[in-house]
Curated annotation (Swiss-Prot):
Family recorded in the similarity comment: Belongs to the bacterial ribosomal protein bL27 family.
Lineage: Bacteria, Bacillati, Bacillota, Bacilli, Lactobacillales
HAMAP family according to UniProt: Ribosomal_bL27 (MF_00539)
PROSITE patterns listed in its UniProt record: RIBOSOMAL_L27
Post-translational modification as stated in the protein's UniProt record: The N-terminus is cleaved by ribosomal processing cysteine protease Prp.
Propeptide feature ranges: 1-12
Sorted UniProt keywords: Ribonucleoprotein, Ribosomal protein
GO aspect biological process, one term: translation
Protein name: Large ribosomal subunit protein bL27
A single Gene Ontology CC term: cytosolic large ribosomal subunit
């Protein structure tokens, strides 16, 4: 006598049993990148750049948060600048009144 339990056979099935997949998920976008443009006037505490790691370094009057977000410490004009040959920084220069 045949043991049919060994080989999960499906006789006379029009559609065979579908397997499962380990795909079908995706994480939400984190909305990283520049939040203020070069030359834009910002107030103190405004977020300038959201990033993972130090893609852009903080310059004058710019702070770095715990998640590497760059923010303005004072009200002023945003400037994206080079820092040496291979690095970039963002600074905020106060507006002269």
């Amino acid at each position: 006598m045949l043991n049919l339990n060994l080989a999960n056979l499906q006789f006379m099935a029009h559609k065979k049993g579908g397997g499962s997949t380990s795909n079908g998920r995706d994480s939400q976008a984190k909305r990283l990148g520049a939040k203020a443009a070069d030359g834009q006037t910002v107030s103190g505490g405004s977020i300038l750049y959201r990033q993972r790691g130090t893609k852009i370094y903080p310059g004058a009057n710019v702070g770095r948060g715990g998640d590497d977000t760059l923010y303005a410490k004072v009200e002023g004009v945003v400037r994206f600048e080079r820092k040496g040959r291979d690095k970039k920084q963002v600074s905020v220069y106060p507006i002269a009144k």
